[in-house]
Amino acid sequence: NLQTKELDATNKEKVNAFAASVNEIDVLFHAVGFVHHGTIMDCDSEEFYRSINVNVYSAYLMSSTLLPTMLKKKQGNIIIVSSAASNVKGAPNRFIYGTTKAALNGFVKAMAVDYVKDGIRCNAILPGTVETPSWHERVNMADDPKQARIDFINRQAMGRLAQPEE
């Protein structure tokens, strides 16, 4: 049985209520993200904390709340969606986004080694850019939208933008 749930993954009470509503969980697929655009000089403390809260704290809260159910069964999968912006090369104008997604990669590695012997697998998916309405908005705000689109595509390992349905 596949069950999906949309909830504010930064809200401890809502996450606890969700955890209480499920008897068991086999897979946590955590796809949460907030993209702040710009360099360190463009990122004020409010955007910094929002990015940490949405991109990192939510993964901690969901994983730490649902992990005990998996540990009881001695099996489970935690899959965290990170980003190609977290890689060593980085991505231009993605200071805090890339930073938080890199933190998620460390988070996943630490959980993986801590719980693999308990039957829990932890992995990260690092997708490239997904062509969404917010992506179109961002590109259209560029000085040269056509060139911005080309630049985005050139940074993608697969030579194109990912589609939401993928």
State the predicted function of each range.
Residues S63, T100, V108:
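Active-site helix of classical SDR
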Residues V32-H36:
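Conserved NAD(P)H cofactor-binding loop of Rossmann-fold oxidoreductase domains
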Residues T39-I40, E47-Y49, F152:
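Substrate-binding pocket helix/loop in short-chain dehydrogenase/reductase
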Residues P127-E137:
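Short, flexible catalytic-loop segment of classical short-chain dehydrogenase/reductase
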Residues C43, K89-G98, A110, R138:
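Active-site loop-to-helix junction immediately N-terminal to the catalytic Tyr of the SDR YXXXK motif
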Residues P68, V113-D114:
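Alpha-helical segment proximal to the catalytic Tyr-Lys
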Residues S83:
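Residue(s) in the substrate-gating loop at a strand-loop-helix junction
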